[in-house]
């Protein structure tokens, strides 16, 4: 059985997230998703929703077999526990594939790293970014 692993913040779930997870699921027989803990999200604004709520929403998706929160201090701990065959990165995630492969190798984790394709909006006004959703909320409600 091929284990695929996706990871991300998944704050304010949107069609871009669904596209990413569906594509990741097609790369394996079983999809694990690591949802970043709020305290570990340092490369962008803090999530709006609590990590447990984001994990529960991701776990409720039919395409996801297992959803879990990331480790509090070492992002590789759940990867070691899951032992995936492939890690699938989102098309716009800031991670560098080569650096991840090196770090995995240094820890004795043998798995590939692939990047999911982008998704274009299906219609005018479709928002595929949490930041854009927040901006729209502020435009209309603040």
Curated annotation (Swiss-Prot):
Keywords: ATP-binding, FAD, Flavoprotein, FMN, Nucleotide-binding, Nucleotidyltransferase, Transferase
Recorded metabolic or biological pathway in which this protein acts: Cofactor biosynthesis; FAD biosynthesis; FAD from FMN: step 1/1
Catalysed reactions, as listed in the record: FMN + ATP + H(+) = FAD + diphosphate
Pfam families given in the database record: CTP_transf_like
Keyword Cell membrane applies: no
Its EC number(s): 2.7.7.2
S-S bonds: none
Cofactor(s) for this UniProt protein: a divalent metal cation
Keyword Hydrolase: no
MF-aspect GO terms: ATP binding; FMN adenylyltransferase activity
GO biological process, one term: FMN metabolic process
Binding residues for ATP: 9-10, 14-17, 92
Purpose of the protein: Catalyzes the transfer of the AMP portion of ATP to flavin mononucleotide (FMN) to produce flavin adenine dinucleotide (FAD) coenzyme.
Record NCBIfam families: cyt_tran_rel
Protein family (similarity comment): Belongs to the archaeal FAD synthase family.
Subunit structure: Homodimer.
UniProt-recorded name of the protein: FAD synthase
């Amino acid at each position: 059985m091929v284990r695929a692993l996706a990871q991300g913040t998944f704050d304010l779930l949107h069609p871009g997230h669904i596209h990413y997870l569906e594509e990741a699921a097609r790369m394996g027989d079983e999809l694990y998703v690591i949802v970043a803990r709020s305290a570990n999200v340092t490369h962008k604004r803090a999530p709006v929703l609590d990590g447990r709520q984001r994990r529960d929403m991701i776990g409720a998706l039919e395409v996801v077999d297992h959803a879990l929160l990331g480790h509090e201090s070492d992002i590789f701990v759940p990867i070691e526990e899951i032992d995936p065959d492939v890690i699938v990165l989102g098309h716009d995630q800031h991670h560098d594939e080569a650096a991840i492969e090196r770090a995995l190798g240094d820890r004795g984790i043998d798995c590939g790293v692939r990047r999911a394709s982008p998704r274009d909006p299906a219609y005018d006004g479709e928002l595929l970014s949490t930041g854009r959703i927040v901006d729209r909320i502020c435009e209309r409600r603040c």
